[in-house]
Amino acid sequence: MKAAALRLGHASVAKRSISLVRPVAATVVPAQMAQKPDAEPIFGQEDNSDIQDAQFRVLGQPPTLCSVHVPASVSLHVRRGCLVSLHGVGEQNAVAISQEWIGLAWNLAKHGSWRAALFHQLVAPRAFSALVAPNVNGGKIASWFGVSAQQFRTLCLLDLDGTQDWCVLGKHSLIAYEGNTSLRIQRSSVWPSWLHFNRGDSALPSTYQLIQGRGNALLSGAGSVYTIELPNENEELILKGEHLLAISGRTPRDIAEAVTEYSFPAVSVPAIPETAVSKGRTPMPTSSLSAFSTALASYSRNAVSWLRHAYTSYINGTTKYLRIRGPRFLLVQSAHNAFMPATSPSAVQPPSSPVSVKAPASTPNSKDYLSYVTVGKDASVSFQSTPDFNKKVAEIEALKHK
């Protein structure tokens, strides 16, 4: 009996085994050849040693970089801070870099800054290549006055053949251009835009640069830049002034006459009627020193607000829509590079005297708004007002006990 029990106990015991295996070190087989990225060469693969004219090529989608091939003894003008790289230079081909101020007084008067006037002039005895990017930004003080700070910008290339003149607007618009004798850059008058005696009735902003002749000019726009063509003089376009980057025309006069200000029809709003002024509590008398402090603080705030508005209007011009007539080409930027007011001018005229609404004689009681609905057997509905529901609830309870 005991033997049978022992055999049964041994049969119910299960065996488990655990084996430990040492990991084998993995080996990585190195690549036999270097990996080639699927990208277009920035400077190209062609030989540029014999080129006669400067060649500009924008790169990327959207274009944020420009490759420039400069022939021997031809200068390249690049705005300060926008030069990214040089290629094809060395001991045998040293590039001479010098600073050049272009329209310093004009930029100080129009934009209140010297940054847009400082360019680098590059020239070498042999051909070389350069990379240019729109690395422009504004200062913190300028942004407080309404001039935009750093934002996303893209490049746009102008290839002038001498048949069209271009008016380029904006503080950060001109990034680079080739220095040949046939390309000319002029600037508008230093007078503000609200003085029209020097420009007739044109609504073209007074902060433009006129590019004429033959050659290449690299522009920069806020956001993305698009081209709009107005094929004939019957074509017109209404465009917000802050989004206009450049406009073409046969002559400067043709450009100025094609731009007029557009005003939307004003919506007539009835004037607010004046009501009698109700006399409330008599204000507590204040000391003369407290009254003087309050008045001085109010006048100071008004003076700062007026100065800021005047400076912003002088720098950016008034926010307005432009009616542009063809035939011509337009360069439009998707984002604006100027201060935008929070609200548009209202057509409502303020009253001549302060307005105050007389308080009602009595406040309506909430009991006057209580009502109950009775639905009859013939589907008729009747509404009745009641000061409270106590009486009606008692009637309903009495009907239930019947």
Swiss-Prot record:
Domain of life per record: Eukaryota
Keyword Transit peptide attributed: yes
InterPro entries: AIM24, AIM24_sf, Trp_RNA-bd_attenuator-like_dom
Keywords: Mitochondrion, Transit peptide
GO biological process, one term: inner mitochondrial membrane organization
Principal subcellular localisation of the protein: mitochondrion
Transit peptide interval: 1-25
Region described as Disordered: spans on this chain: 343-365
Coiled coil stretches, renumbered: none
GO CC annotation: mitochondrial inner membrane
Biased composition (Low complexity): 343-364
Localization (cell): Mitochondrion
Pfam families in alphabetical order: AIM24
Family as reported in the entry's similarity comment: Belongs to the AIM24 family.
PANTHER family: ALTERED INHERITANCE OF MITOCHONDRIA PROTEIN 24, MITOCHONDRIAL
Protein name (record): Altered inheritance of mitochondria protein 24, mitochondrial
Lineage: Eukaryota, Fungi, Dikarya, Ascomycota, Saccharomycotina
